[in-house]
């Protein structure tokens, strides 16, 4: 398989995962080891085993719950701190890279603290909860001369690079639209896994948890990226119309659709739900005047205007992709040309998330359209016929309220995104009903 040129993406061949980097062995720190932070711990362990990383420090606030990981971390040579602030004081000026896989509401303050301590940062997606937070991260990053890489993992895969380069090169003609749809049912346990799941706020801090700011955040970010006029930049966003819904007893939406207009006139459509009975993995379709490209979980396909498949590229496996991300951020330490998903790219996603909440309150789906059921010992909730309703809207490039087939749908207002720099734009914003 051909690879993208290093001058653009800095990608490596799939058989060369975590090859020696031109940077010296990087000293790294980690925040947390539970939940998704365990993914980062495993990545760091592989990096240490391959001589790429020196594991210096980790924050573990629940050490009594993670005795085995604490033992393993000590064997790897890292110092364990009980709080993030203590760790930051201990590592100031001593690490090249800090991994921050924490709750969304903690991203901005932790990233900024790590930058001020002289570390580059890899933060899990999204970059932060609000547009003003992402802008502040960007300012501090530039002032401190340190980078921030955001964990929108698919943007580090060669297949998505190929997809965007093909679009930019006119491989599907003039780009007409980019859209995504995904249905991933979630159980009660999903919303009880931590203190912030399904929340719009945690105390005084914005959380804005939702399918499009968490599980399907990758796809929303990708459609913004794919519509960008240059490889390194996402689309510039002009306006958004969103529809946000909840079937569960939560504050945040569990179902959403939105239409985002780019300044270049290309519409971006997005559909997601956690309250379907069926699981339908996410798909992205970029349609042009002379064909289309389709991203799915296993790869990217290029079709001509007659629907004939021209070419296909596979996506990386999970472990391979996580190692590819590490290789990219390690190379970025010494080579500013190495492609990462930085705040400049991730900002479009956060603007879309914030704009969606400006456009629509979170409407309650009436109980008569919802069903509770138990499967494999887990409690689930589903909205009747939502698979067909969302699929029909997706196929027709319509929002749910525009199809005329969804009795509970409520249209949101058009909200302008150009020059949008603060969430919420109005102090009296009504978030849910």
Each language-model region and where it sits:
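Predominantly a Rossmann-like dinucleotide-binding segment in NAD(P)-dependent oxidoreductases
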Residues: 36, 154-240, 246-249
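N-terminal Rossmann-like dinucleotide-binding module
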Residues: 2-75, 430
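Hydrophobic residues in well-ordered beta-strands that form the structural core
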Residues: 82, 123, 148-150, 295
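Rossmann-fold dehydrogenase core element
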Residues: 136-154, 174-177
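Beta-loop-alpha module in the N-terminal Rossmann-like domain of NAD(P)-dependent dehydrogenases
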Residues: 78-140
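Contiguous beta-strand/loop segments that form the cofactor/metal-binding neighborhood of enzyme cores
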Residues: 10, 15, 207-208, 214-339, ...
């Amino acid at each position: 398989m051909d690879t993208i040129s290093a001058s653009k993406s800095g990608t490596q061949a799939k058989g060369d995962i975590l090859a020696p980097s031109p940077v010296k062995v990087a000293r790294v720190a980690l925040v947390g080891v539970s939940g998704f932070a365990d993914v980062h711990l495993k990545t760091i362990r592989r990096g240490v085993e391959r001589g790429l990383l020196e594991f210096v420090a980790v924050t573990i606030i629940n050490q009594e719950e993670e005795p085995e990981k604490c033992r393993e971390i000590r064997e790897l040579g890292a110092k364990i701190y009980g709080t993030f602030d203590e760790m930051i004081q201990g590592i100031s000026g001593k690490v090249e890279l800090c991994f921050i896989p924490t709750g969304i509401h903690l991203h901005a303050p932790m990233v900024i603290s790590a930058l001020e301590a002289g570390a580059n940062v890899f933060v899990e997606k999204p970059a932060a909860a609000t547009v003003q937070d992402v802008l502040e991260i960007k300012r501090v990053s530039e002032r401190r001369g340190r980078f921030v890489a955001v964990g929108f993992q698919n943007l580090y895969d060669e297949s998505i690079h190929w997809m965007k380069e093909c679009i930019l090169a006119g491989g599907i003609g003039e780009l007409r639209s980019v859209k995504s749809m995904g249905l991933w049912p979630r159980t009660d346990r999903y919303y009880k896994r931590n203190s912030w799941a399904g929340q719009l706020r945690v105390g005084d801090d914005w959380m804005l948890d939702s399918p499009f700011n968490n599980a399907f955040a990758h796809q929303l970010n990708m459609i913004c990226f794919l519509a960008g006029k240059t490889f390194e930049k996402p689309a510039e966003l002009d306006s958004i119309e969103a529809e946000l819904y909840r079937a569960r007893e939560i504050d945040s939406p569990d179902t959403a659709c939105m239409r985002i207009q780019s300044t270049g006139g290309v519409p971006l459509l997005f559909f997601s739900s956690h309250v379907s009975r069926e699981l339908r993995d996410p798909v992205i379709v970029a349609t042009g005047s002379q064909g289309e490209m389709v991203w799915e979980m296993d790869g990217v396909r290029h079709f001509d205007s007659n629907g004939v498949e021209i070419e296909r590229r596979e996506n990386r496996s999970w472990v391979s992709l996580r190692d590819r991300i590490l290789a990219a951020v390690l190379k970025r330490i010494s080579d500013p040309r190495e492609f990462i998903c930085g705040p400049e790219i991730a900002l479009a996603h956060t603007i879309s998330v914030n704009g969606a909440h400006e456009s629509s309150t979170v409407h309650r789906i009436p109980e008569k359209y919802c069903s509770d059921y138990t499967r494999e010992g887990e409690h689930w909730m589903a909205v009747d016929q939502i698979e067909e309703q969302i699929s029909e809207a997706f196929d027709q490039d319509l929002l749910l309220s525009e199809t005329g087939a969804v009795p509970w749908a409520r249209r949101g207002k058009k909200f302008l995104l150009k020059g949008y720099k603060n969430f919420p734009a109005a102090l009296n914003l009504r978030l849910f009903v």
